Regions:
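Acidic, glycine-rich active-site loops and adjacent beta-strand->loop/helix elements
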Residues: 86-88, 151-159, 182-187, 210-212, ...
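A short beta-alpha structural unit
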Residues: 330-333, 360-375, 399-400
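C-terminal catalytic subdomain
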Residues: 233, 309, 314-344
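N-terminal helical capping/dimerization or prosegment-like subdomains
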Residues: 1-94, 323, 340
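Zn-dependent metallopeptidase/amidohydrolase metal-coordination segment
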Residues: 207, 231, 316, 320-324, ...
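Active-site metal-coordination/substrate-binding segment of hydrolases
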Residues: 77-149, 443
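Acidic-enriched catalytic cores of C-N bond-cleaving enzymes acting on peptides and small amides
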Residues: 187, 196, 217-307, 336-358
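Acidic/histidine-rich catalytic neighborhood of metal-dependent amide-processing enzymes
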Residues: 114, 119-197, 456
Length: 457
């Protein structure tokens, strides 16, 4: 297998690869909004056609929600499953975008050329890196280097409600020697990374109800309970002055970081002042006895993501509201059980309610943390391949976010997961003006060709 010929083909094909990516990016496959259901179908159809054009047996597979795309190609050698997701986040607030989020374009910036648009980095640009590596390999050699399965999801950004039932129903077809997930990032702009630790996630939507209707604050203010005041007091008590979460038992299943891992993380270059300064901050707000990387990668969190109630429109209305609402998310680590944390949090909130107030709940998300099996030989081989491409030693890192599919592959298919991606910290995923560096896209494709060559041996 001549790798150099594949790399040359990739270099030559970059303009066409960018055109293909932009065609996919123009499809507004927002999975959380039912108005875009047809667009999610179109994105899945586009990917099926692209995979078939390379010689894969590919199909759009129905679910109760958005379809999965499953493709198979190659024979012999190890069996590798590649995962990505074709759905994207909503684009609100649209007014903050510099251009139409679904009219992607290449822009010149002080740091180089970038592709701007929703889904460029999360995750269409990323999944197209491995598809383009497959395309180049097939064009040069006439076949794939080993047995490949491609598994593309359409509900990752909306909680993956169809994922587990689909894995259970299709376990025999999808089970491979290892799952490879391209939905992570670089450690620094030119230092590749393999993510070995992921935080879990659960979300809660809380409504506190007091009076049975909105009241006039002149007629009832001071005498009637105000749910916004109750909610604000409870949320303010969620953390102590040192940043520790006050829900009873919250830290019971949180393991201390092994010293070897802590030492490796401390050896990584990480400029905390720049990390915070890039978003207009200067002082860490988490647990004050932890290093910044520990806060981000190995410690649990509780964050209020939204709070509302009463009158929030233009002008002024002296209302005493009937209800107050909040959305709270928890990032989980180690052995924390999402169901246990949810029950503890609800009990803690309800224990603080005054008379005449009730709490109602809506659950969002429910995934435990994940720790990857770095003793799998594929990790060392992939690390060497990334080092060869980027000219910098690839590093093992944690991630503050959640990629539940990694844990699902282990729990339901018995597969370890290898997480490699080429996103950069300033890609603005989930935010207006999302971008993906053209260099990340180009070298990401080359990286996958090198990984394929090493894993297929």
């Amino acid at each position: 297998m001549r790798l150099d010929d594949v790399l040359t083909r990739i270099d030559t094909d970059v303009p066409a690869a960018l055109d293909r990516l932009m065609a996919l990016l123009r499809i507004p496959s927002i999975s959380t909004d039912p108005a875009f259901r047809g667009d999610c179908d179109r994105a899945a159809d586009w990917l099926v056609a692209d995979l078939q054009s390379m010689g894969f047996e590919a199909a759009k597979r129905p679910t109760p929600g958005h379809p999965m795309v499953v493709a198979h190609g190659g024979t012999g050698g190890p069996h590798l499953l590649f995962y990505g997701h074709y759905d994207v986040q909503p684009v609100d607030p649209l007014s903050l975008w510099h251009r139409d989020p679904f009219d992607p374009a290449i822009e010149d910036t002080p740091k180089g050329r970038v592709l701007r648009g929703r889904g460029t980095s999360d995750d269409k640009g990323q999944l197209m890196t491995f598809l383009e590596a497959f395309r180049a390999w097939k064009a040069v050699h006439g076949s794939f280097p080993c047995r490949l399965t491609v598994f593309l999801e359409g509900e990752e950004e909306s909680g993956s409600p169809s994922l587990i039932p689909f894995l259970q129903a299709n376990a025999a077809e999808l089970r491979a020697d290892i799952a490879i997930i391209c939905d992570t990032g670089m450690h620094e702009d030119h230092i590749p990374a393999i993510t070995t630790m992921l935080r879990g996630l659960l979300g809660e939507e809380l409504t506190i109800t007091g009076p049975d209707k909105d009241l006039h604050s002149g007629s009832y203010g001071g005498a009637a309970i105000n749910p916004i005041r109750v909610l604000s007091r409870i949320l303010a008590a969620l953390h102590d002055a040192k940043g520790r979460i006050q829900v009873p038992g919250f830290y019971d299943d949180v393991d201390e970081l092994p010293e070897a891992i802590r030492a490796q993380w401390q050896s990584l270059s990480f400029d905390n002042a720049k990390f915070l300064g890039d978003v207009g901050l200067s002082v860490p707000a988490g647990e004050q006895d932890r290093t910044p990387l520990e806060m981000l990668w190995s410690r649990p969190t509780a964050e209020v993501n939204g709070i509302w109630g009463g009158y929030t429109g233009d002008g002024f209305k002296t209302v005493l509201p009937s209800e107050a609402h909040a959305k709270i998310s928890f990032r989980l680590v180690s052995r924390q059980n999402p169901d246990k944390i949810r029950a503890s949090f609800r009990a803690w909130v309800e224990s603080q309610l005054p008379p005449d107030c009730t709490a109602t709940w809506k659950a969002h998300g429910n995934s435990p943390a994940g720790v990857m099996a770095i003793d799998n030989p594929a990790f060392d081989r992939a690390r060497a391949a990334l080092t060869d491409e980027w000219g910098q030693p690839a590093v093992y890192v944690g991630a503050g976010g959640s990629i539940p599919v990694a844990r699902c592959f282990k729990d339901y298919l018995g597969m370890d997961a290898l997480l490699i991606g080429f996103a950069r910290d300033d890609d603005q995923i989930h935010s207006p003006n999302e971008k993906y560096d053209v260099e990340s896209f180009h070298k990401g494709i080359r990286s996958w060709a090198r990984v394929l060559e090493r894993l297929a041996r």
